[in-house]
Regions:
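Glycine-centered flexibility motif
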Residues: 13-14, 31, 36, 90
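A general structural signal for well-ordered secondary-structure junctions
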Residues: 19, 77, 128-129
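Conserved hydrophobic/amphipathic alpha-helical signal-anchor segments
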Residues: 31-70
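Extracellular/periplasmic head regions of type IV pilus-like filament subunits
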Residues: 57-115, 140
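Low-complexity, S/T/G/P-rich flexible repeat/linker segments used as non-globular hinges
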Residues: 112-141
């Protein structure tokens, strides 16, 4: 009998199974990374909200004039809090008075729609409103 070269069916099934497992592992790690980004952004939003509430508690009647730089100067935000290019998607953070001066808007740029939906869900019970447009997510407190 001649010595035949090639792959057996078992070898092919084994290789295909290993490739499938590797592809699944890659997919799972990307989901974990996105989850970490969403939660990191949520923590930063909470810090900005707390700083803004401290601004009001210090005797300011409305959020008029609130800014990241102002909150840092007043000591409500750490001096090393960076608003530019520092959110988990490489975009910016900003804080500003809402059209209602008793409310504040916190926005993140560079956010994808899936992450924006997850952020909105996280703040559904505590925010007055959330919106997403042109890669910018805004939450109002």
């Amino acid at each position: 009998m001649k010595n035949k070269k090639g792959f057996t069916l078992i070898e092919l099934v084994l290789v295909i199974s290993i490739v499938a497992l590797l592809l699944m592992a890659i997919g799972l790690t990307s989901g974990v990374k996105e989850n970490a980004r969403v939660h990191a952004a949520a923590e930063s939003v909470k810090s900005l909200r707390t700083a803004a509430e401290s601004y009001i508690a210090a005797g300011n009647m409305t959020y008029t004039g609130v800014s990241i730089a102002g909150l840092q100067t007043a000591g409500y935000l750490p001096a090393n809090f960076s608003a530019t290019g520092s959110n988990p998607w490489g975009g910016n953070y900003s804080i500003a008075v809402d059209s209602d001066p008793n409310k504040v808007d916190i926005s993140l740029t560079g956010v994808n729609s899936t992450a924006a939906a997850r952020l909105s869900a996280l703040f559904a019970n505590s925010a007055s409103a959330t919106s997403y447009s042109y890669n910018a997510w805004i939450v109002t407190f």
